[in-house]
A protein has these predicted regions:
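Bacterial N-terminal signal peptides
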Residues: 6-18
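Vicinal oxygen chelate
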Residues: 22-30, 33-43, 67, 83-107, 109-160, 181-200, ...
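Mature N-terminal segment immediately following signal peptide/propeptide cleavage
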Residues: 29-63
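Conserved active-site tyrosine of GNAT-family acetyltransferases
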Residues: 48-53, 108, 132, 168-173, ...
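Conserved catalytic-core motifs of GNAT/GCN5-like acyltransferases
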Residues: 58-65, 179-184, 242
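Positively charged n-region of N-terminal signal peptides that target proteins for export
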Residues: 1-5
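Conserved acetyl-CoA-binding loop of GNAT-fold acetyltransferases
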Residues: 53-60, 112-113, 173-180, 234-236
Length: 271
């Protein structure tokens, strides 16, 4: 009887909150890597939380951080005063997929969100309350959930007269086992749960740390061994492998050669 009641309650939760049963991280690739999270520094956490819930997130917490769960990635919110928005930093914006952009826009406008139609078919942009970034929304008619994380878009300037795009693409392939490819006209690299998109920036860009999008995170299987492998290859750890039993995770930090602050975690997939 108790087992039956538990199953009934689970089914009711899944029906009322459809994202609750689907908002999970992807299984790792052969290198043990998948998309983990995006960590945002916001002035008003409650306003940020309200925005992401209206977008379609399922809420939870990790310590003091509000966590907005989406299929493919988590959005973590931390109160603070960001040094600037995403434009001008290495990561220009993040993006999601929806099955129908027109229907999604109508829903978001009804919820009071700022949303603008994009220049390309099946594209729109959402603007969080602090207006320090824009979130790209792309239509994917084959999507079987209301919304899912899709991409992180990097902008990198040329270095010494040569394009940095092939170099950053190769770095993510080598470091995380990403698969090189294209997304439309852009060079890209795919990891489970995310497309990493690379575009030339005509102006210099600054590191992400301290800005509204402070860092991105990858979930790693056997993080301790992965960190040892990174160090053996010459990659410096900004924060060494650390166990956080109070949070139920382990973590480390690195910075890519273009200034992207990256958290490596093990355990966020249990949220």
């Amino acid at each position: 009887m108790r087992k039956m009641i538990t199953m009934i309650v689970f089914c009711l939760v899944a029906f009322v909150f459809p994202g609750a049963s689907r908002a999970q991280l992807s299984a790792p690739n052969d290198a043990g890597v998948s998309m983990g999270h995006v960590h945002l520094v916001v002035q008003d956490v409650e306003a940020g939380k309200k925005f992401w819930l209206a977008v379609g997130a399922t809420p939870t917490k990790l310590g003091a951080n509000e966590v907005m769960k989406f299929p493919g990635a988590l959005i973590l919110l931390r109160k603070g005063e960001p040094a600037g928005g995403t434009v001008g930093s290495v990561i220009n914006h993040i993006g999601f997929n929806v099955p129908n952009v027109t229907e999604a826009m109508a829903k978001w406008k009804t919820a009071g969100l700022k949303v603008e139609l994009g220049q390309n078919p099946g594209q729109c942009f959402l603007f969080p309350p602090d207006d320090l970034t824009r979130v790209e929304i792309l239509e994917n008619k084959a999507l079987t959930v209301p919304i899912a994380f899709h991409h992180v878009h990097f902008f990198v300037p040329d270095a010494a007269g040569a394009s940095s795009v092939p170099e950053i693409q190769s770095w993510y392939v080598k470091t995380f086992g990403a698969k090189a490819g294209k997304r439309g006209p852009f060079e890209a690299a795919d990891l489970p749960g995310v497309n990493l998109t690379f575009t030339k920036s005509d102006t210099p860009t600054v590191p992400t740390k301290g800005r509204m999008l402070d860092h991105i995170g990858f979930e790693i299987k056997d993080l301790e061994a992965f960190c040892k492998k990174l160090e053996a290859s010459g990659t410096k750890l900004d924060v060494p492998f650390t166990k956080r039993p109070e949070l139920g995770i382990s973590m480390a930090y690195i910075t890519d050669p273009w200034g992207t602050y990256i958290e490596l975690t093990e355990g966020l997939n249990k949220l």
